[in-house]
Amino acid sequence: QYVFQNIADGMATAIEIGLRKTSTKFFYTIWCDQIGLSSKTVKETIQYHEKSNFIASFPAARIKNNYTLVEKNKLNYLKKIYQSREEKLGKNSGLNDCGFFCCDTFFFKKNLKKLISSKKIVSKKTREHDFIYALNYFAKSYKIKKKITKNKIDTLGVNFKKDILKLKNIS
């Protein structure tokens, strides 16, 4: 079964619409531009998540010239994901997410729509309901875990021609 987001107002909204038709214990979402993500990383992250009690898990790799920068807390859980499209990243290198997220369906069905309605996850630049902002919000009170992958290509997303040139520099 397919669902459609009639108004392009962010990934959080797109995910929430999909959740209305989801009945599985877990759901998985991937950004459509994530051409570098390997099936091995997807499989390992799903297995990792399904054995955990985290509301969300995602793979991340250490790279230079990050698009996102993953910050962890003292217990190694997600503290925040910074996005270069929203703000200047303070570091040249660090953990970058891979655009793939494993999540607890019940938790997100219960909480994501309320968070969207509250307007707390509207991005400054795109004015869309941002799923990364939702993860950052939930990370303040719930366990979200990153799974390290050594495959830097897993982080590669292509939106523009210039992004293809990153293939040369990613290793």
Spans of features found by a protein language model:
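Conserved N-terminal catalytic core of the sugar/cofactor nucleotidyltransferase
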Residues: 1-40
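Residue-level signal for inorganic ion chemistry
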Residues: 18, 33, 70, 104, ...
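Short, high-confidence coil segments that cap the C-terminus of an alpha-helix
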Residues: 23-24, 51-56, 142
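A short acidic, often aromatic-flanked loop/helix-cap motif at beta-alpha or helix-coil junctions
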Residues: 8-12, 65, 153-155
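Conserved core of the sugar-phosphate nucleotidyltransferase
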Residues: 37-122, 129
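Conserved alpha/beta core of the MobA/IspD/sugar-nucleotide pyrophosphorylase nucleotidyltransferase superfamily
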Residues: 24, 94-171
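Conserved beta-strand termini and adjacent loop/short-helix elements that scaffold enzyme active sites
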Residues: 3-6, 59, 147-150
